[in-house]
């Protein structure tokens, strides 16, 4: 009950912001660009080891990411280019955050970790492949958004990792980003494999339906003349 009340309160705040931005004739594309700019700042903060502030900036950046689409729908300014811009800059936003983490763990400091650099790089490639698999699959099938580690889940994991990581602390609960990178590295490839399998299954199902339809049409076209011939033979005068 308490959680639902918080959710409703947050939604009312977001709805008010959307209405205000729509009435102010703020372009949804401007909101998209502001969001990606904040994500670039987040990547820089990660690179310098300012994890807590990177988490705060990431929250604000993804608030803009939520607002742009809603403002576009409310103001009637939904465009194909806007959708393309939003999707493209989302990929850039993901990558700059991963790169910031790779820079932090690759620097010649006491926090240097080759393993964490590898995990961040693997998670970066996996997240790109998840997005690419979805985009490519949807040119072949109606929808491909399966998998448990999509972009919203990655953002939440980044925020959890950022706000619960304090470089220099030996406490496991104050250094969660490495664990987050493990989850994202493994989860991204699992989601990629799931989307590959889903696309294969849907294409096979479509092929079976097409073959069944062709076979049905072929049978119907062949049975028609036979029935007409039988009717002619039956009614032919002796």
What is the role of each PLM region?
Residues 1-55, 62, 96-238:
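Hydrophobic alpha-helical transmembrane segments
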């Amino acid at each position: 009950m308490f959680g639902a009340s918080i959710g409703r309160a947050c939604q009312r705040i977001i709805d008010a912001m959307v209405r205000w931005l729509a009435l102010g004739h703020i372009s949804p594309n401007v909101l998209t660009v502001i969001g990606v700019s904040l994500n670039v700042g987040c990547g820089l903060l990660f690179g310098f080891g300012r994890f807590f502030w990177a988490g705060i900036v990431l929250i604000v950046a993804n608030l803009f990411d939520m607002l742009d689409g809603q403002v576009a729908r409310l103001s009637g300014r939904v465009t194909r280019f806007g959708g393309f811009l939003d999707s493209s800059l989302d990929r850039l936003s993901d990558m700059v955050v991963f790169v910031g983490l790779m820079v932090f763990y690759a620097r010649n400091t006491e926090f240097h970790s080759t393993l964490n650099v590898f995990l961040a790089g693997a998670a970066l490639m996996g997240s790109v492949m998840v997005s690419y698999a979805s985009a490519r699959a949807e040119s072949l099938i109606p929808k491909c958004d399966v998998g448990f580690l999509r972009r919203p889940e990655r953002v939440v994991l980044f925020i959890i990792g950022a706000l619960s990581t304090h470089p220099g602390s030996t406490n496991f609960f104050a250094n969660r980003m490495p664990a987050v990178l493990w989850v994202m590295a493994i989860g991204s490839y699992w989601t990629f494999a799931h989307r590959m399998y889903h696309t294969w299954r849907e294409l096979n199902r479509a092929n079976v339906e097409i073959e069944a339809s062709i076979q049905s049409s072929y049978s119907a076209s062949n049975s028609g003349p036979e029935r007409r011939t039988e009717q002619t033979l039956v009614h032919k005068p002796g």
